[in-house]
Amino acid sequence: MTRSLKKGPFVANHLLRKIENLNLRKEKKIIVTRSRASTIVPTMIGHTIAVYNGQEHLPIYITDRMIGHKLGEFVPTRIFRGHARSDKKSRR
């Protein structure tokens, strides 16, 4: 189910404050956050946000094509190492 339009997108307050402060000063710093549920809004374009994946903070450069998506969509939390191999040779 999608979010109601009258509520607007969810963006963590601390993240929004940091981005607005950097936009006022016209600085480009890496913003470290754990808020994977925050929606990417147009004020974030051009910033690099390091999002926590459970082990480390992975930096993401925000572009205009990412608007409307969540930060967590761009940071994988699981590592796929491939399916288990079949042991047909050892069974013979």
UniProtKB/Swiss-Prot annotation:
GO biological process: ribosomal small subunit assembly; translation
GO molecular function per UniProt: rRNA binding; structural constituent of ribosome
InterPro entries membership: Ribosomal_uS19 (IPR002222), Ribosomal_uS19_bac-type (IPR005732), Ribosomal_uS19_CS (IPR020934), Ribosomal_uS19_SF (IPR023575)
One Pfam family hit: Ribosomal_S19
A GO-annotated cellular component: mitochondrial small ribosomal subunit
Cellular compartments annotated: Plastid, Chloroplast
Source taxon at top rank: Eukaryota
Disulphide bridges: none
Keywords per UniProt: Chloroplast, Plastid, Ribonucleoprotein, Ribosomal protein, RNA-binding, rRNA-binding
Summary of the function given for this chain in its UniProt record: Protein S19 forms a complex with S13 that binds strongly to the 16S ribosomal RNA.
Protein family: Belongs to the universal ribosomal protein uS19 family.
HAMAP family referenced in this protein's UniProt entry, alphabetically: Ribosomal_uS19
Name listed for the protein in its UniProt record: Small ribosomal subunit protein uS19c
Species, as recorded: Angiopteris evecta
Gene that encodes it: rps19
